[in-house]
Swiss-Prot record:
Gene3D superfamilies: Cysteine proteinases, Rhodanese-like domain
Protein name per Swiss-Prot or TrEMBL: Ubiquitin carboxyl-terminal hydrolase 4
Subunit structure as annotated in this protein's UniProt entry: Interacts with BRO1, RFU1 and VPS32. Associates with the 26S proteasome.
Physiological role: Ubiquitin thioesterase that acts at the late endosome/prevacuolar compartment to recover ubiquitin from ubiquitinated membrane proteins en route to the vacuole. Also removes ubiquitin from soluble proteins targeted to proteasomes. Is essential to maintain a normal level of free ubiquitin. Involved in the ammonium-induced down-regulation of the GAP1 permease and the UME3 destruction in response to oxidative stress. Has a role in the RAD9 checkpoint response to TOP1 poisons. Required for promoting coordination of DNA replication and avoids DNA overreplication.
Domain USP: 562-923
Highest rank taxon of the organism: Eukaryota
GO biological process assignments: protein deubiquitination; proteolysis
Cellular component, GO, one term: late endosome membrane
SMART domains in alphabetical order: RHOD
UniProt key word Lipid biosynthesis: no
Comment, domains: Residues 1-208 are essential for the localization to the late endosome and constitute a late endosome localization (LEL) domain.
Means of activity regulation: RFU1 is an inhibitor of deubiquitination activity.
Origin organism lineage: Eukaryota, Fungi, Dikarya, Ascomycota, Saccharomycotina
Length: 926
């Protein structure tokens, strides 16, 4: 088998003209070998025992090779050359791992013998016969293999090696292309990025690349390409008659010494890259500089054999529009020496402003009912927060924040005093000039009852943009047919951290920022003959909305109901779409297209808007059919599913999937597409000193600070609507030392406790199980940094931030994919106040006071109203998904089953034993 795989890998390398194969290519080889050795021929009749033996044999080879791979990777990290034989061993080992993984996780679970053994294990607690002993041994072997795969540390290193090697190969190829180019040629942003990356990793004694920015020093200081060796040569500082000596002695006379030294070494660089902006004079001077360096370098002649001079195609504007537009830096004075953790050490919060939050967020229309008025004067949980400020009659009155937190959002414009209204409650969270805001809302005047805008100062109403502008932006921002180049969005058990930027509440609860929630609100055989494997988007497909005419003044009926066709086991997708569209705030921004203005094509984890725009298209199609149709109809979400599959291959085929995983993927993907901070650098880890100080703070304060740090890298409307946070605290039983991490969530997965024969299980029981203090087993004990060894320890989760819309996943499947069918009783009105961290003790970090930490809507009580239930029937391998969704007072609850939907006669039907994912939104005054 080994020689066969090696031969296949070599053939593929020759075919692709590459020393390395990609992860996808190696996975395809593994799948082919499984078909060849496991499924076809004589292997077709192999039983569970034979498959397990095959896996054990392959695993032993994998483990043996892993020892050699550690040495290979270690040598590579030290800069040593890697032989072709070593590369083959690494690629071979990946194929071995993938073969075992596919057999254990896919092939074996589909064996009838495996299903019978699981059934016997779950239904029989008696008997010790040979058959049962044999079955027990087989299951032990299977579980051991599965655990070995999950805990294997080598595969991550192998994948990292393969990916980095492929990246380096690509860089080398592009650099070779540059080596063949002549001085004076134009290079693309891709080629420049390759040269910069190659230079950063180069071990050569020759200096690699020097960039010369031909713009004014002011523009250069504002923003320039981020690289080590770069100088600014102002276009006005030289002329055609200059030589290289004149450039050094005259043009650079006021430049920093570091730039002068770089220019003095210009003839030692392998590449010199010139770039400027679109200014006509600057472009002309760029040509003049090229001529000086090539033809008038008398003091230090530049040889084309040693140093090549290129011009950046499309200049700096082209670089900004490219995939590397985020790789820019500023030379202006800054606080770059301030660490992210300085807020804990000396109370300096200005470090957070280094990563800019967006100026705008999507606008959402909504009305506040009378229950909100009561909340506006409710007390806050922090001792130092005062009651609501009296209404100000002066229209120029603007509430401000104090101390260093004013710097946090210093890039935003102040609100226009003319937009203020003396009849509105003076809510600082809606008028702070220096804070970003998540969502502008509409709320009635508490005196007149009229619908007046509550203005987030920096956020215009997006629906005022014309449809023409929207369509233009669509075409400019996205090539809809570039699915093949989309990086996958990896769905996690709890979605990737995402944050919102809701402004600070001053003196009283921030409830209006939460009032968006005031609105009420599969695994089956295919019901369609369409084969997903045949589905494709033609080159003519585009995301136009010519079939819909959204206007700024249109009053959408957000409670529309339309069925969705099953494309082959796609009920898992249909039920989640129906529930998600029960979230009025989200539906609104995709109907009025205000989302489009916030697509961030430079977001590192986004799909360049593919997912968001095809989701918008689906919402428009559903709304149009509901509006125009006179009877119950359904539509096909085929193109949306294709878009999902292009982003994550898990949803590409017609195989069965978990609806909660799709829910996490969808919200995570929409967030990344709309993430206004998606190109910001990641947060630095806290120093030991900062972490020690954080541990002394209450969860209430520490979690607020961590949320503020979070905001600097992730901010979108998805975050603002669905994001929460919990704390995970480890505690040593010997010395009582603690360590706490703060984890954001979009879908909160809670366990189902064991059923007490006397009592039913409630969702509150599940939350108690989720937040209980857990004693860690011997093999899970924490390595206490204070004791410097593993000690008896505990772990406890605490919810520190509850979102506007809470999605709860009932964990019905265990690690062996067995389903817990116990009836979990969940109410229409859920109170989670007891589970929210409310431990504020009056202690703040040094130098920080109560005026500086935003509350961001975290004011109890936390009551939630049910508006959606995704139900699962059957097993994970053969079941079906449906949904109950609340569609307002007029339509009430509807039951969705793919293409079919019907009113629910008794709303109590929404409370049922098949509930799997629950959708709640926060309500007030109840």
């Amino acid at each position: 088998m080994e020689q066969n795989i090696i031969s296949t890998i070599r053939d593929e390398c020759i075919r692709h003209r590459s020393k390395y194969l990609t992860i996808a290519q190696l996975t395809a080889i593994a799948e082919a070998k499984i078909n060849e050795f496991i499924i076809t021929g004589k292997a077709k009749d192999q039983d569970l025992s034979s498959l397990l033996d095959k896996c054990i044999d392959i695993l032993s080879i994998y483990k043996k090779n892993s020892k050699d791979i550690k040495n290979i990777i270690s040598c590579k990290n030290k800069g040593a050359m890697i032989s072709s034989n070593s590369v083959m061993i690494i690629q071979l080992n990946y194929v071995y791992y993938k073969v075992i993984h596919i057999i254990v996780t896919t092939n074996i679970p589909h064996l009838s013998e495996f299903a019978k053994i699981k059934l016997h294990k779950s239904t029989s607690d008696e008997g010790n016969g040979n058959n049962n002993n044999n079955e027990f041994q087989l299951m032990n072997i299977y579980n051991t293999l599965l655990e070995t795969l999950l805990k294997d540390e080598n595969i991550a290193k192998i994948k990292s090696f393969i990916k980095s090697s492929i990246k380096q190969t690509k860089l080398n190829h592009e650099q070779e292309e540059c080596n063949l180019m002549r001085t004076g040629s134009y290079i693309t942003s891709n080629q420049l990025n390759s040269l910069i990356s190659s230079s950063a990793n180069s071990t050569s004694s020759q200096m690699e690349i020097l960039l010369i920015d031909i713009r004014s020093r002011l523009e250069f200081n504002k923003s320039h390409i981020d690289t080590k060796n770069i100088i600014c040569l102002e276009p006005i500082s030289f002329k055609m008659s200059y030589s290289d000596h004149d450039l050094e002695k005259k043009s650079l006379i006021t430049s920093p010494n570091s730039e002068i030294k770089m220019f003095q070494s210009r003839n030692l660089f392998k590449f010199i890259i010139l770039y400027t902006d679109a200014n006509e004079y600057n472009v002309k001077q760029q040509s003049v500089l090229l001529d000086i360096l090539v033809n008038h370098s008398f003091e230090k002649p530049i040889s084309d054999d040693f140093t090549k001079i290129f011009i950046l195609e499309s200049g700096f504007p082209g670089w900004l529009k490219s995939n590397y537009g985020s790789q820019v830096s500023s030379s202006s004075p800054s606080n770059n020496n301030i660490k992210d953790d300085s807020v804990y050490i000396n109370g300096n919060t200005s470090g957070l402003s280094l990563q800019h939050l967006p100026k705008m967020s999507p606008s959402i229309r909504h009305s506040m009912d009378d229950s909100m008025k009561e909340m506006l004067v409710a007390p806050t949980p922090l001792n130092h927060l005062q009651q609501q400020q009296q209404q100000q009659s002066d229209n120029d009155h603007v509430l401000k924040r104090s101390s260093s937190f004013k710097k946090l959002f210093s890039n935003y414009t102040s609100p226009n005093p003319k937009n203020s209204n003396s009849n509105l409650y003076s809510i600082s969270s809606l008028s702070i000039s220096s804070s970003p805001s998540p969502l502008p809302l509409h709320s009635p005047d508490p005196v007149k009852g009229n619908s007046l805008p509550i203005n987030y100062p920096e956020t215009p109403h997006l629906w005022k943009n014309s449809e023409t502008d929207f369509m233009t932006n669509q075409r400019e921002q996205l090539n809809h047919n570039s699915f093949a180049h989309i990086a996958p969005i990896n769905t996690k058990a709890i979605t990737s951290p995402s944050r919102t930027a809701t402004p600070k509440l001053q003196r009283f609860p921030q409830t209006i920022s939460m009032n968006l929630n005031m609105n009420s609100n599969g695994h089956s055989s295919a019901t369609s003959t369409i084969q997903p494997s045949c589905l494709s988007l033609s080159n003519n497909d585009s995301l136009d909305h010519t079939d819909v005419t959204p206007t700024s003044s249109h009053n959408y009926d957000l409670d529309f109901a339309v069925g969705l066709e099953n494309l082959g086991n796609s009920c898992y997708m249909n039920c989640i779409i129906q529930c998600i569209l029960g979230t009025h705030e989200l539906t609104q921004i995709f109907l009025d297209d205000s989302y489009a203005k916030h697509i961030n094509i430079n977001s590192k984890l986004g799909s360049k808007g593919i997912l968001a725009k095809y989701f918008a298209r689906l919402v428009h199609m559903m709304y149009k059919e509901q509006v125009d149709g006179s009877k119950k109809i359904s539509i096909s979400p085929i193109k949306f599913k294709l878009a999902c599959g292009s982003v994550n291959s898990l949803f590409k085929t017609a195989s069965q999937q978990d609806c909660q995983e799709f829910c996490q993927f969808l919200l995570d993907g929409l967030h990344e597409d709309l993430n206004q901070c998606g190109s910001n650098p990641p947060l630095k880890e806290l120093s030991q000193e900062a972490e020690a100080r954080r541990e002394k703070l209450s969860l209430r304060i520490a979690s607020s600070i961590e949320w503020e740090r979070f905001l600097t890298t992730d901010f979108s409307v998805i975050v603002d609507l669905f994001q929460g946070q919990y704390a995970s605290r480890l505690k040593c039983k010997v010395c009582s030392h603690t360590s706490t991490t703060y984890q954001p969530f979009t879908v909160l997965s809670i366990p189902i406790p064991k059923k007490n024969s006397r009592n039913n299980i409630t969702i509150e029981d599940c939350f108690r199980e989720f937040t209980k203090c857990e004693n860690l087993e011997v093999d899970e004990q924490w390595l206490c940094p204070h004791c410097k060894k593993r000690q008896p320890s505990t772990k406890q989760l605490t919810i520190t931030r509850l979102p506007r819309n809470l999605i709860v996943h009932l964990k019905r499947f265990d690690n062996l994919l067995n389903k817990n069918n116990d009836f979990v009783i969940y109410p229409f009105l859920l109170d989670l106040t007891p589970f929210w961290a409310n431990d504020f003790d009056g202690v703040f970090p040094p130098g920080v006071n109560d005026d500086e930490l935003p509350i961001r809507g975290q004011i109890p009580p936390f009551k939630y109203e049910l508006y959606g239930v995704a139900c699962h029937f059957g097993t994970l391998y053969g079941g079906h998904y449906t949904a109950y969704v609340k569609k307002g007072l007029k339509k009430g609850w509807l039951y969705f089953d793919d293409t079919k939907y019907k009113p629910v006669k008794n709303k109590a039907d929404a409370i049922n034993s098949n509930a799997y994912v629950l959708f709640y939104h926060r309500v007030y005054g109840v």
